[in-house]
């Protein structure tokens, strides 16, 4: 049974001293959440417990989460186009920003759902994150997928401070290129 009072939203592991930084990942309860992110420990569809936001792009926010029935750590990508949407007062429901943006918002959500369908078709392919399911709640769409810990390519490249050699780039990209063939 999960003890939410001692669960770290930064890594979804037990933090025996929740008032102190997590001994596993260093997350502090004083960490500022990303703007427009779901509140930590929100629950989706009664089965996914939301942890910290992992990142944000123009069309969505990705969260660390836990599938409650199995206590499996997953990543959940939320459709949240920052230029077209805002949160309702409940801090969970996503709303088109303005009346004239509803069409663009819903068209984008349909495209987002297609992205989920493509990811589902590619499940089982080496080099591609594993799709788990698609959710539609809070007036938006969510893609639930396997959580792969580690650095993003962008962060990795920033740390390296030098470009990949042709051989390194090919080694990294080859499984993805084969999956997309």
Stretches with model-predicted labels:
Residues 172-173:
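Activation segment signature within eukaryotic-like protein kinase domains
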Residues 89-122:
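AlphaC helix of the eukaryotic protein kinase fold
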Residues 66-74, 80-84:
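Conserved N-lobe loop of protein kinases adjacent to the ATP-binding glycine-rich P-loop
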Residues 31-50:
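A short, low-complexity linker immediately N-terminal to eukaryotic Hanks-type protein kinase catalytic domains
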Residues 51-57, 62:
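Protein kinase glycine-rich loop
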Residues 176-181:
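Protein kinase catalytic-loop region centered on the HRD/HxD motif
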Residues 138-152, 156:
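Conserved short submotifs of the Hanks-type protein kinase catalytic core
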Residues 134:
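Activation-segment/catalytic-loop signature of the eukaryotic protein kinase fold
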């Amino acid at each position: 049974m999960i003890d939410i009072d001692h669960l770290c939203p930064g890594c979804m592991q037990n933090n025996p001293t929740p008032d102190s930084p997590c001994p596993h990942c260093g997350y502090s309860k004083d960490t500022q959440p990303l703007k427009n992110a779901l509140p930590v420990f929100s629950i989706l569809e009664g089965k996914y417990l939301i942890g910290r936001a992992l990142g944000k792009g123009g069309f969505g926010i990705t969260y660390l989460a836990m599938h409650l029935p199995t206590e499996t750590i997953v990543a959940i990508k939320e459709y949240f186009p920052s230029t077209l949407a805002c949160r309702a007062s409940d801090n969970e429901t996503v709303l088109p920003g303005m009346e004239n943006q509803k069409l663009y918002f819903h068209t984008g959500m349909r495209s987002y759902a297609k992205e989920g369908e493509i990811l589902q078709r590619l499940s089982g392919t080496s080099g591609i994150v594993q799709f788990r399911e698609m959710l539609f709640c809070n007036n938006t769409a969510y893609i639930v997928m396997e959580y792969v810990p580690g650095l993003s390519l962008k962060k990795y490249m920033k740390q390296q401070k030098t470009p990949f050699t042709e051989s390194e780039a090919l080694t990294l990209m080859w499984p993805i290129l084969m999956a997309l063939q």
